Amino acid sequence: MYKYAFFDLDGTLTDSGPGIIDSAIVALKRFGIEIKDRKDLYPFIGPPLSESFRDMFGLDEENVKLAIQYYREHYNVHSIFAGNSVYDGIEDLLITLKEKGIKLVVATSKPAHLAIRVLDYFDLSKYFDYISGAVANERIHKHEVIAHALEHLQINNLDDVIMVGDRKYDVIGARQNGLKCIGVLYGGYSTLEEFIEVKADYIINKPMEIVDIVMGEKND
């Protein structure tokens, strides 16, 4: 049995994809980049914005900073809650894990203050013992926000912790910290092949499947 379950936010707890994609489209238009199919921006959901703008669209460092500025100007005002919703079964999952004594943590590359706004908006903050996110352009990578949470909570036995996320970055970040990871497919922003490629420890289709893994895994 695990004692801690670390959760990604976007695409794992909430479907924030519509707002993220809207804001990315607005930012990219400032550079003359038109997006014909919104699905082309699904990879935006997961990695740090700087990596997405650089790797997907070839923006240099200066323009990456501008793109992030344009993105956040739109997202913070218009998109943080637009089309955003809690996935079916998530609240039941969190309630069940809390009732079983599992400590719950959010580990997201989203700025911490925005993560808190989203969790507060959906009345989910009450389930979490700690929220770890990016702060002032620090801790922007998944392995960094996970490491920060581990340090803050003074967790020494890594076998007590499992990560839950919807993208390969969650699996990779967890592994860099010595943790196992559950890859979730219900969000619709990842694929089975993506998780197989990075060797996710578990791959699930429904939120409540997480309970059996957290409670049934032998780690002693």
PLM-predicted stretches and their roles:
Residues 125-140, 160:
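A short, structured active-site edge motif that brings together acidic residues
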